[in-house]
Swiss-Prot record:
Similarity-based family: Belongs to the arabinose isomerase family.
Domain of life, source organism: Bacteria
GO cellular component: cytosol
Name listed for the protein in its UniProt record: L-arabinose isomerase
Keywords associated with the record: Arabinose catabolism, Carbohydrate metabolism, Isomerase, Manganese, Metal-binding
Reactions it catalyzes: beta-L-arabinopyranose = L-ribulose
Gene (UniProt): araA
Residues annotated as binding Mn(2+): E306, E333, H349, H448
SUPFAM superfamilies: FucI/AraA C-terminal domain-like, FucI/AraA N-terminal and middle domains
A GO term for molecular function: manganese ion binding
GO biological process, one term: L-arabinose catabolic process to xylulose 5-phosphate
NCBIfam families according to UniProt: PRK02929.1
Entry keyword annotation includes Isomerase: yes
Amino acid sequence: MKAFKQKQVWFITGSQDLYGPKVLEQVAKNSEQIVYGFNESSAISIEVVYKPTVKSPREIHAVCQAANSDENCVGVILWMHTFSPAKMWIAGLNELSKPFMHLHTQFNAELPWSEINMNYMNTHQSAHGCREFGFIGTRMRKERKVVVGHWQSSDVQAQIDDWCRAAAGWHESQNLRIARFGDNMRQVAVTEGDKVAAQIQFGYEVHAYSLGELNEAIAAIAEGDVTAQLDRYASEYQVGNELFGDEYQLDRLRKEAKIELGLTQFLTQGGFGAFTNCFENLTGMTGLPGLATQRLMANGFGYGGEGDWKTAAMVRIMKVMGQGRAGGTSFMEDYTYNFGATDQVLGAHMLEVCPSIAAAKPRLEVHRHTIGVRCDVPRLLFTGKAGPAINVSTIDLGNRFRIILNELDTVTPPQDLPNLPVASALWEPRPNLAVAAAAWIHAGGAHHSAYSQAITTDQIVDFAEMAGAELVIIDADTKIREFKNELRQNSVYYGLARGL
């Protein structure tokens, strides 16, 4: 079973009538076998759909139009089995609005040395057929992924899956609706941004709602549904006897369950995939949602604290991209440092860290929240699972959006954190904290990020290219002087690119 159950990537093979029916029959047969192999492979998480070989400008244009109008098609894979004159592709590529990958492969891995003849050469000529197609893509300035290698190799299939996941994320971005309850935290700069420009570039919509509308949805939740929700909490988390045995704590938990159910209903009925709130805008609420927000993220919703709709969008998009993979994705904040033999970052937030990144079964506890509405708030406590991760931040620079990515190594804390009443993750940024933090600051990266152990750097690279957005990467090879030069060069390129 594929992780993406209703989404598809179309496989389109290019050729021409010049070769005659026998060769074209072989081309079609080989294409069908490749598609079958992809669908049988556990490495590729989305259904690949075979489309008949295209041999003329009219056929190419028609299949590109069909891909555009198919809601389940998130992208297309294009392969030139033989030579397919590239002028035939101009109208179709001009029309194509879905992302496309150029797969530079051939059906047979090895040459049949003792049997090879000109018939074989004319049938299996992607080595130069794909170069012809590559030229027209470059000439038309089409952003695309190029994957090179035999279609059965694990490396090629991993690259295909990365791109397919990015295409699914891009499809989600085009259809995503984000609900904002309240506004940005007052006087904060980086969470601001041009929502119209974001919708033009990324596709997602951001809509504001009053707390009164949300409170109405919460008030409408039946007490019986709240009781059933508490039973779910007891079965899914570590819960001390004192929580359910203490009348006050139980009341706080019931209020939190009611918030979760009301918020879920509001978002679901409105077709929203992500939301934001702000501790400064909680009129009528019993408190800042803690457990409720954590569970909504665990169920796939994106979230951004303090009105941060850009991060909420990225959390949702990355959750979609990571479907079926080990590891989770969460809203996150660089909170405090541990300077020592190896400098580290303790990431957390007031309440809202997703349990999908937890190293062990989370504990459900009630603790005092002292910012905004000061009250006792139920929340899940855990530390993040050790392993590779990334932090991704999207910022608005006024004339463009920039995505900043830092590769991390999450580690197990050397000691317990018995007095910390929030979930957290401890990581070592690559190449080290000194370089990573300086680069992040030079790039203008936010204090919020989308943290993930399910998503790879390559997937974010593919997504950024689909979006036409600037991406800068901080990894083991980053050097500050080179990184600052990259930022300067990007400023020139993206400033000129709009007019080219």
